[in-house]
Each structure stands twice: as C-alpha cells, then as structure tokens.
C-alpha cells in the first residue's frame, strides 16, 4: 500500500516598520523606538490632532500616513510538508514498511526605511545646537568631546533583511515478521532503522545610506558602523 500526504502554506504580508524592543533590566521599562503601529498610534494619540498634518517626533517631521508609506516591513513565509508511507508484504508473515517525511520552512523579512521617513530624518535632525546635543541618533566623536554631534546618515535611508530557512527530513524503515508454529508457538521479530537530519540557516544584511529615490545607490560614512 502507498499513502501520500502533503501540504503547503504561503503568506505574504506588509507590516508597519518598527524596531525591536529595548528592555531596561534595572527599571523594568520596555520601550520601542519608531513605533508606528496604527492601532498603537490611534490609541495613544490625542483626537484633536489632524492626521493629515505634519508634526515633530524624534526632532524630525512626522506624519502617520507618510510613515506607513515610507517605513514598512515585507514578510514572506513558506511552510511545506510532505509524507510518504509504503507497506509491502513479500511473503506470508513478513511486512516491510518505509516511512519518509520532509519539512521545509523559509521566511524572509525586509525592512524598508526610506529617505523621507521619520526614522531616516531623525538621523539628520540637527537644526540647532540644542537639538544636536539632545538627539541620540547623532554621532559623538569620543576622541574629540568639543566637536558638535554629526549625522551618520547624511543621505538616503536604511535597509534590513533577514532570511531564515530550515529543512528537516526523517526516514524510517522497519521489518516485522510473525509466524505461528504448531498452532501454539508464536514468533515475532521486529527490526528497523531511522535517519533524521535538520539543517538551519540564517542570513542577515544591513544597508545604510541607500537612496531609494536615486536607484538604491548607497552613500554612507564610516562613522555609522
């Protein structure tokens, strides 16, 4: 007998761009920079604010609609599973069985922070000395404390990409022999082998100074790194 089972699922989604959580292990405070989740924004923003107007956040221009168009994450996920079971009886009392299973999972996450997003503009917010000193996204030269903080992202935006892949297969072969002697003696023999393998891969890429409006040409300075 032969039995085949298979299934696959694919998901493509676009989510608002955001960074990972920062946890203060001393005070227990949890915060997330550049959080533009629409539900969170609507829940924590005053209703008297005009959603089409431009305000200031992180010392840079901010508009929620502009952010959703210029700071987002594209997610692609694939999950496929297949199973094969084969049973064969070459002679009376002997059954051979082969079971194989294969699973493959892949996910890709691309975070686009375009030139005009609040996050990219925050790295360039230094209109006066007060903002320069207060903006934590500017670079302060540790070797020259008297120099004003400078931007590490004079042009362009940011790009983050992460790939996660996993392949898993399992093969099991068994043999079962059963025989009755003189209608009162029963002999059962069973043997088998199993082979399992799991392989995981993770790749990450971070690009700085990518000019989305100029053919994705990078322009960056070494202080960013």
Identify the role of each PLM range.
Residues 2-79, 97-99, 103-225:
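Surface-exposed loop/interface segments of Gram-negative outer-membrane beta-barrel transport/assembly proteins
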Residues 91-92:
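Long hydrophobic segments that form regular secondary structure
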């Amino acid at each position: 007998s032969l039995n085949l089972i298979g299934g696959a699922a694919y998901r493509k989604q676009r989510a608002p761009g955001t960074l990972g959580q920062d946890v203060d292990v001393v005070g227990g405070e949890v915060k997330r920079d550049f959080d533009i989740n629409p539900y969170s924004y609507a829940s924590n923003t005053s209703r008297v604010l005009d959603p089409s107007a431009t305000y200031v956040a992180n010392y840079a221009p901010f508009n929620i609609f502009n952010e959703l168009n210029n700071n987002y994450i594209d997610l692609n996920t694939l999950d496929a599973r297949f199973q094969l079971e084969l049973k064969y009886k070459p002679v009376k009392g002997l059954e051979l069985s082969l079971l194989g299973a294969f699973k493959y999972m892949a996910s890709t996450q691309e975070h686009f922070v375009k030139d005009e997003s609040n996050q990219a503009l925050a790295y360039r917010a230094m209109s006066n000395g007060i903002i320069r000193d207060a903006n934590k996204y500017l670079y302060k030269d540790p070797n020259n404390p008297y120099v004003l903080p400078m931007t590490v992202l004079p042009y362009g935006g940011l790009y983050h990409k992460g790939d996660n892949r996993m392949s898993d297969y399992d093969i099991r072969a068994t043999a079962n022999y059963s025989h009755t002697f003189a209608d009162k003696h029963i002999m059962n023999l069973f043997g088998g082998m199993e082979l399992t393998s799991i392989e995981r891969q993770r790749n990450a890429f971070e690009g700085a100074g990518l000019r989305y409006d100029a053919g994705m040409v990078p322009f960056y300075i070494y202080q960013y790194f």
